[in-house]
């Protein structure tokens, strides 16, 4: 199947700043002190396919903020899948600015389709905004529970995240530990740190210092692939 057809964007939504710039011009929505407005732009392609579905559910990191969507790591995963002749279709459900609470609210609608592998990438915006970690943990757990309620056979991959120590070391450490603890408690696959080898490397991030460049996205894709590939049948 043609790569463009296989890479269906179930939901591409961009968080626009007050000045209404395009994604490549705007500041990062992940800055907790900046008020934002959320504008959803929905694009769906409904071509029939017998392929199994891998759904990436996340925030601007998944949505490839500041880049063309083809440069994002979900599309890089699709390219790897296609190169091996595997019958999987990647769906990118990344929403810029998304918190775990927002993800929890929209997940039920996203799961109206059959999903074989669900990759959960949320929490970074919670951490940057200092949201109570009890809420972050509860929301992530609720999303895992909902995926299993919808389809117990869906395999889940949890993408671990880390944040700078702006909120203090206790908060930062507890935030980092949420992901391995939830992965162990729920017996789901864990990507230890989604931005391994990218975070803190200026040349691999946009000017905001948060979102990966195209080269950074390729490294993220390799990090994800190390965990995802063994799951694919």
Predicted regions and their residues:
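Bacterial signal peptide processing site
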Residues: 19-23
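Short histidine/acidic/glycine/proline-rich micro-motifs that form metal-
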Residues: 61-64, 68, 94-98, 125-127, ...
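Sec-dependent bacterial lipoprotein signal peptides
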Residues: 1-17
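Serine-esterase "nucleophile elbow" of acetyl-processing enzymes
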Residues: 30-96, 106-114
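N-terminal helical cap/lid subdomain that shapes the substrate entry/recognition surface
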Residues: 101
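Conserved Rossmann-like nucleotide-binding pocket used by diverse enzymes
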Residues: 15, 91, 157
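Alpha-helical cap/lid subdomain in secreted, periplasmic
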Residues: 104-233
């Amino acid at each position: 199947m043609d790569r463009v057809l296989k890479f269906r964007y179930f939901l591409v939504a961009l968080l626009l700043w007050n000045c209404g710039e395009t994604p490549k011009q705007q500041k990062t929505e992940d800055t907790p002190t900046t008020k934002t407005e959320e504008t959803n732009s929905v694009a769906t392609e409904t071509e029939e396919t017998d392929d199994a579905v891998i759904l990436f559910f996340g925030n601007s990191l998944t949505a490839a903020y500041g880049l063309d969507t083809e440069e994002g790591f979900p599309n890089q995963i699709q390219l790897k899948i296609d190169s091996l002749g595997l019958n999987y279709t990647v769906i990118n459900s990344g929403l810029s600015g998304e918190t775990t609470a927002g993800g929890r609210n929209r997940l039920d609608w996203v799961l109206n389709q059959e999903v074989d592998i669900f990759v959960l990438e949320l929490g970074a915006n919670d951490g940057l905004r200092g949201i109570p970690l009890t809420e972050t943990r509860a929301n992530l757990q609720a999303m895992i529970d909902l995926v299993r309620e919808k389809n117990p056979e869906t395999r889940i991959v949890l993408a671990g995240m880390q944040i700078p120590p702006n909120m203090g070391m206790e908060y930062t450490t507890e935030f980092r530990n949420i992901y391995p603890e939830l992965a162990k408690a729920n017996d789901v696959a864990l990507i230890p740190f989604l931005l391994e080898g990218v975070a803190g490397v200026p040349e691999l991030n946009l000017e905001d210092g948060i979102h990966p460049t195209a080269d950074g996205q390729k490294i993220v894709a390799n990090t994800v692939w190390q965990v995802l590939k063994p799951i694919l049948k």
